[in-house]
Amino acid sequence: MKLLKSTASLGGEILEMDLSQKLSQEQINFLNQCWNDRLVLVFKKQNLDDNKLINFSKNFGELDPPGPNPYGVKFLPEFPEINVISNVKNKEGTPIGNLGDGEAVWHADMTYQETPPKAGILYALEVPENQGNTHFANMTLAYDELPNKLKQKIDGKTLIHDSAHNSACLLYTSPSPRDSGKSR
């Protein structure tokens, strides 16, 4: 197992690791160390079914269910931990997943929760030939690079928002976390 570091401020590719197999504690420790150092890890050419994806994910802690979606549909009811993200529609024109074309604009996952998940795992079944258009930002570095005057102005402040709308401003059909006292 190896880490190939990106030249960017975050990111790295994990080499020589088969995620479909049960990981040893040494491998889990290695991945945690790499993740803490690089913030985003890429594992190419993996072959995981839904169970194996969940088993791999559980190596890093308890899994959070996905947030609400605008369709009010559980796309994989047998795997409630998995959020299907797709721009594909079935024959009837119904989306087969969340975040279709136009919705997945710049965002941070599930930050409306009191304690947002510490990580997300994105497993791509199909990747465009141009490698898609997904980007990640090092928000710790962004904060560190702010002018001291701005840091003083915002330190101690809290932002409150909810999940009533998605990133494309579509109203979700699921209840807002505010209704259950879960908002941030």
What kind of feature is each model-predicted range?
Residues M1-T134:
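Non-heme Fe(II)-dependent double-stranded beta-helix
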Residues L23, L48, L146-K149, P175:
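Short coil/turn linker and secondary-structure boundary residues
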Residues N133-L171:
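Hydrophobic, aromatic-enriched interface-forming segments
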Residues Y172-D179:
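Conserved small/polar residues in nucleotide/adenosyl-binding loops
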